[in-house]
Amino acid sequence: MSAASLRLVDTPMDKQKALDAALGQIERAFGKGSIMKLGAREAMAETEAISTGSLGLDIALGIGGLPRGRIVEIYGPESSGKTTLALHAIAEAQKAGGTCAFVDAEHALDPAYARKLGVDVDELLISQPDAGEQALEIADTLVRSGAIDVLVVDSVAALVPRAELEGEMGDSHVGLHARLMSQALRKLTGSISKSRCLVIFINQIRLKIGVMFGNPETTTGGNALKFYASIRLDIRRIGAIKDRDNVVGNQTRVKVVKNKMAPPFRVVEFDIMYGEGVSKVGELLDLGIQAGVVEKSGAWFSYDGQRIGQGRENAKTFLRNNAAVAEAIEAKVRANAGLVASAMMGAPESDGDAASPD
C-alpha cells in the first residue's frame, strides 16, 4: 500500500467512521450501554452519596457521605463504633426511602440498639449465615436484584470458609479466607456499580508478627478489599465521656485512609453517646468552632454574641433544647464546608501491603 493511501485512511472522518463501527460492533455483542462517553449519562458523571449520620464525616469525605455503587471498608479495634457508623448510614438511607440489608455474620446485631439509632428494624432485611460462602452469595443475590440501596456485611473476620467450619480445631487453612474474599469481590464489583448499591464491609484489626518498623496493624481477609474499596475508614476510640463518675459515651476519631472520590487523609472527631449514637449537637459545637461560627472563650461557648453554655456538656444541652439555633449553626457550617475540610487534613499513614488482589 502506498504512502498516499495510508494518509487518506488517516483523516479525521475515516477515524470517526472506524470508531462508530467499533462501537456498533461492541453494542451488538454486549448490549446497549456497554460502552459510552463518560459524560453521556448524568448518573455516570455525578456520584450520589448517602449520609453517614455525622456532619463532620460527610464533609471529610468530600462528597457529602458514602458513595452509591461503591465498596466501603470500615475498620478499627473492638468497640470503636464500626457497627454504629454502619447503622447510621442505614438509618439515613431509610429516611430517604431506601431499602437496606444487613448480613450479620457475627450474629451480634442488637435490634433495640439499632432502633435507638433511627433504624426502621421492621423494614431492615437481615441474614445470619452459617458460612462465609453463604454470606457472600446472599450479598451477591441482593446486590444483583437492584432493589437494595445499602448492604452491610458485619464482619469480614466472621466470614469463615466452609472448609474451616467442617474441619477440626487446629487444622491449617492458609490463605483460604483471603482467596474467598478475592473471588467474591471480583464477582461483586461489577454488579455493585450497575445496581448503584452502597456495600459496607466492617473489618477487624490484627497484628502482623515480626514487624519492627512501621505500622504492625493490618485488616483480616487479605489485600483484596484494600484494593477494591473506594473508601476506607479507620475508626478509633480516643477517650471516654463521663457524667460525674459514669461513662456515658466515647470520644471517637475517624481517619479517611483511602478515598477515590476526594482528597484522603482527613481526620474528624465526634462523640458517640451510649444509646444515642453520634452526638449531632456535639459535632455542631466542634465544627462551629472550626468554621468560625461558634466562639469559645475559656469554658464559655457563644453563638451570634449570645452565650449558649459554660462547658461543653451545658452547651450541648442548650443546642438540644433549642433546635432553631442548632439548625442555624448547621446551615453556616455547611456553607463553610471548605474551610472545615481544610482543617481536617492529617498525615498519610505508610502501609506496607502492596500485593495484588489475587
UniProtKB/Swiss-Prot annotation:
Keyword terms of this UniProt record: ATP-binding, Cytoplasm, DNA damage, DNA recombination, DNA repair, DNA-binding, Nucleotide-binding, SOS response
A cellular-component GO term for this protein: cytosol
Any GO molecular function: single-stranded DNA binding
Binding site for ATP: 76-83
One GO process term, biological-process aspect: SOS response
InterPro entries cross-referenced by the UniProt entry: AAA+_ATPase (IPR003593), DNA_recomb/repair_RecA (IPR013765), DNA_recomb/repair_RecA_CS (IPR020584), P-loop_NTPase (IPR027417), RecA-like_C (IPR049261), RecA-like_N (IPR049428), RecA_ATP-bd (IPR020588), RecA_C_sf (IPR023400)
Pfam families assigned to the protein according to its UniProt record, in alphabetical order: RecA, RecA_C
PROSITE patterns linked to this entry: RECA_1, RECA_2, RECA_3
Subcellular location: Cytoplasm
Similarity comment: family membership: Belongs to the RecA family.
NCBIfam families (UniProt xref): tigrfam_recA
Entries under PANTHER family matching the protein: MITOCHONDRIAL DNA REPAIR PROTEIN RECA HOMOLOG-RELATED, RECA
Task performed by this protein: Can catalyze the hydrolysis of ATP in the presence of single-stranded DNA, the ATP-dependent uptake of single-stranded DNA by duplex DNA, and the ATP-dependent hybridization of homologous single-stranded DNAs. It interacts with LexA causing its activation and leading to its autocatalytic cleavage.
Protein name as annotated: Protein RecA
Primary gene name: recA
